[in-house]
Amino acid sequence: MKVLNNLLYTGDHEWVRVEDNKAYIGISDCAQRMLSDIVFVELPEVDDEIAKGETFATIESVKAASDSYMPVSGTIVEINEELEDNPAALNEDPYGSWIAAIEMSDKNELEELIKPEVYEKICEELDKEA
């Protein structure tokens, strides 16, 4: 299982990559492993204002449907339209296949996210339970 050191994570297995005031959001390798084969992604709309903790996307796999929760508040400025035609990209490259980019309204919310070394331990524990 892969955890990248240049990202921040949530307990719900989303990752955040920050570029200035923009944050790219996706699902972690741990999440895509739990979901198994992803068959559909319901993307948010550009210009949607989403608060931290709100659902911003729904991911359907052969196992289940799972909501993805926004790790930081702000306005959606970009969506990864490739996922409409190729949702399996989240399985193939979970860290290269972001779901949405958000213009953050409060960068201080980043401080509440999980550091890579801590997230890696969380995933290792989940692997042991599986």
Swiss-Prot record:
GO biological process: glycine decarboxylation via glycine cleavage system
Keywords per UniProt: Lipoyl
Modification sites for N6-lipoyllysine: K63
Requisite cofactors: (R)-lipoate
Manner of cofactor binding, per the entry note: Binds 1 lipoyl cofactor covalently.
Domain Lipoyl-binding: residue ranges: 22-103
Matches recorded under CDD domains: GCS_H
Role of this protein: The glycine cleavage system catalyzes the degradation of glycine. The H protein shuttles the methylamine group of glycine from the P protein to the T protein.
Protein family: Belongs to the GcvH family.
Subunit-level organization: The glycine cleavage system is composed of four proteins: P, T, L and H.
Protein name: Glycine cleavage system H protein
